[in-house]
Amino acid sequence: MTSTEGTGGGDGKGISGFSDIERRSILDPHLSVLELLRRPSDTRPHEALKGEVSDIVGNCAGTTGTGNGSISQSWQTIHRNDSCLSVVPERCPSQATAAGILSSSDTSEDEPDAVNSPSAVHQQLHATPPQKHTKSLEDYRSLNVGIPLVLPEDSNNINNNNKNGSTTGSNGEEDDNDTITKSLNSSSNSFIMPKLSLSQKTQKFRILVLGRPGLKFYHSIPKKYQHMFELPRSHDPAEFKQYTGILVVFQELKEMVSLLNRVCQCNPNRPVIPVCQSGQRQQVRNLLESLLKNRLVSLLYPPVVVNNQPDLLGMFRFLQELSKTVSDNSDMDAEEPNNGSKRLKRSLQRKKKKFIETSAERNGRPHKKRHNNEKVNRWVLWGVSLTLGVGVGYCISHLVSSTWISLTTNPLGPVDPESVSKDLFVFDRQELKLGEMDMDSDHPFGHALFLFKQALKQWNLAVKQFLGRHLSCMERIGPANCLEWPTSDEHTNRVLALGYVML
């Protein structure tokens, strides 16, 4: 027995020494990780492995049995932390969602309660009876997976616990469930609805068709222009403010007067377009003239005969152009809010002026018309007239002065033969150089031209003396600014030409 025990003890020592060698290294050089994990565990007693496993799983070591002998000594360096038992490294989606919803204020209050209060993990571990057989590393892995998750308890349970055991809570604190609801509502309403302002509406061009034959006239309008017209919805004059103008269709003048009275009740007044029957245009014009003078109504377009298709098409084109102007102006309301009303007012004034002119022509009143051919720039006419006047005046003054001089000059005498050597001709004791002698003076035409030039010169001198007498007062006012007339013929001609221009 002794030898057997000694042998058994020697074998036990040999086995323990071999296991100590195996525990020094995690991996064997000739074995894979899977084979290392499936290696059979040693048969050490339960008390020997209890100290090693207790550093890993805490209180679970006393109830779950011995661990695998292949776990190395590096696992023993992990210190015990009881607060980590409620923390699972692998989180499920429900736990992640719950952690995202809860606020940071809740975790600080629940941490000490989770450590002190017995959780489901503690109850499960203590309730498990101790087992004598050993478990491998796979058993511990399955044990970790089987640990239930510690999720936040229901609000009803929390309230019951607070009523039974807790005395630190106050009545003024908000419940966790309410806090979660508020945070979800505030996060979901992140979109802010912009404020819409209906104070400035876009101006739309619309013409109201008013009168008993209005429905028939509306259906006779071409489809191209029908979108600009609308039929009345009621007989209230306050409805007229929504329209740009009012088209009045009538059969008798009494209807026209009653319709215009309704239009006058609208403030501000809307411009009208009268559509009369054949033979009523002149009467309608006379009636409208009195209303326009008193500013009771305004005219958008002259009266149109309902059977006259060219006049109707002209009215439709005018309204279409006016609608484009109003629509273009509505895009610029932020910069120029009153620009559309000004343009509409200008167009109404032009149409009103045209209507008055046509009515004056029909009544036989004289009216001045300006054709396109007469729209010539006046400055061009004035420039051409001044140029022609100066040129003609200069020519006349030159001819008159030359003729006057030739007439007043004494005739030439006989030539003195003694002056030939001196390049001079002496005529009646007057010397004349060769360069100054007129070779054409023997001809009658040349002599007449010479006399005409001399006459113009003499006329120039006479006019100069006449102007000098009337301008002598300037010498008395300012002797420094006295008018000194030049003696040469060139200056004389210029002064005479200036006199003609001034005249």
From Swiss-Prot:
Regions of compositional bias (Polar residues) in chain numbering: 116-126
Membrane topology, as annotated: Single-pass membrane protein
Segments crossing the lipid bilayer: 380-396
Disulfide bonds: none
Keywords on record: Autophagy, Membrane, Mitochondrion, Mitochondrion outer membrane, Transmembrane, Transmembrane helix, Vacuole
Ranges for region Disordered: 98-138, 151-186, 328-370
GO process terms (BP): autophagy
Gene Ontology CC, one term: vacuolar membrane
Compositionally skewed regions (Low complexity) per UniProt: 155-171
Coiled-coil annotated spans: none
Compartment(s) where it occurs, according to its Swiss-Prot or TrEMBL record: Mitochondrion outer membrane; Vacuole membrane; Preautophagosomal structure membrane
Record's compositionally biased regions (Basic and acidic residues): 355-364
Biased composition annotated in UniProt, kind: Basic residues: 342-354
Family stated for the protein in its record: Belongs to the ATG32 family.
Function, as annotated: Mitophagy-specific receptor that recruits the autophagic machinery to mitochondria and regulates selective degradation of mitochondria. Mitophagy contributes to regulate mitochondrial quantity and quality by eliminating the mitochondria to a basal level to fulfill cellular energy requirements and preventing excess ROS production. Recruits ATG11 to the surface of mitochondria. Also promotes autophagy-dependent peroxisome degradation.
Protein name per the record: Autophagy-related protein 32
Naturally occurring in which organism (per UniProt): Zygosaccharomyces rouxii (strain ATCC 2623 / CBS 732 / NBRC 1130 / NCYC 568 / NRRL Y-229)
Name of the gene encoding the protein in the UniProt record: ATG32
